[in-house]
Amino acid sequence: MLIACFFGMMGVMPISNFLVSLVNSHGGGSTALGAAQFLMAASELPSALVFGLLQKRMSSAKILLISIVFMMVKPLLILASGSLGMLLAVQPVQMLGYGLFFPASVYFANESVAPADRVQGQSLRTIVAISLSTLLGSLVSGYLLDLGGTTLMLWFSTGCAF
């Protein structure tokens, strides 16, 4: 599961990090970038608020897998967006991707290790599934963005989640 989280995050974090390039490629400027960032951030809040209720219906592992699927869907939807309006409309998918990922990964790490090892489990989750994946995803995506633009970067993001 840690490997799936690594690749899911490696695919989705460059979208946040290079959102300015995505907005510019759709004809937007600073105002549109602010709107896109707002939509992404605001859509994560409901996920955090309803996570406890959702977890009563399914395991954190299942929620984690669902979030990774939506991390794969988001770059595909961005690829399909032909206008700035469509790009902005895609941003709330963050609710079902990263919005669910973060609380589910915390709970999953706690459930997967012995109580005495939970600090190490959370540290490993943070280092591998978030820090290293973001570092590598951003490095590769930045290169691909220079090499072939946002389309190539988004195909990389999609491929990471598979």
Task: Please tell me what each predicted stretch does.
Residues 142-161:
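A membrane-interface helix-boundary motif in multi-pass transporters
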Residues 79-91:
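Helix-loop junctions at membrane interfaces in 12-TM secondary transporters
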Residues 41-49, 131-135:
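Residue-level signature of mid-helix packing/kink "hotspots" within the transmembrane helices
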Residues 46-59, 145-146:
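Helix-to-loop junctions at the C-terminal end of transmembrane segments
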